[in-house]
């Protein structure tokens, strides 16, 4: 198990596109406190925490997942509210556990569920999002 967090400040995406996340609401102070508490809990349980200036947590998750794909019998489950993580789903080897609409339910996405939701496999999500 590992945990990945965004760091404050701009990322390489802001440099490439100045309006990146320009329409996004400011993060709530209570959420910031909850994230800090979560980091403390992860640290207390010895869970490694990864962050890197200029990169978002999902970039780091993608890098870790890519490195783990070489492991033959390793199943990876990503727990994230960021639906961009669905692009990492790879048959039964990589799945994404996320919230359904709202916070009342959860869903574990495998390749079949991603395809059912979007009408195409996870590997095409990057192109789809780029064209939207």
Residues of each region from the PLM?
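Extended, highly charged clamp/arch subdomains and adjacent linkers
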Residues: 1-5, 9-21, 34-40
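Extended two-metal-dependent nuclease catalytic cores across DNA- and RNA-processing enzymes
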Residues: 22-132
């Amino acid at each position: 198990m590992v945990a990945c967090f965004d760091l404050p400040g701009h990322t390489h995406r802001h440099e490439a596109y100045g309006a990146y996340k320009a329409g996004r609401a400011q993060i709530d102070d209570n959420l910031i406190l909850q994230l800090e508490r979560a980091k403390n809990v992860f640290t207390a349980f010895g869970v490694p925490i990864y962050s890197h200036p200029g990169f978002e947590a999902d970039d780091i998750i993608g890098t870790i997942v890519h490195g783990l794909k070489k492991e033959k019998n390793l199943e990876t489950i990503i727990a994230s509210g960021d639906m961009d993580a669905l692009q990492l789903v790879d048959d039964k080897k990589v799945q994404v556990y996320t919230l359904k609409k709202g916070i009342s339910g959860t869903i574990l996405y495998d390749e079949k569920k991603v395809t059912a939701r979007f009408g195409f496999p996870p590997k095409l999500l990057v192109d789809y999002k780029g064209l939207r």
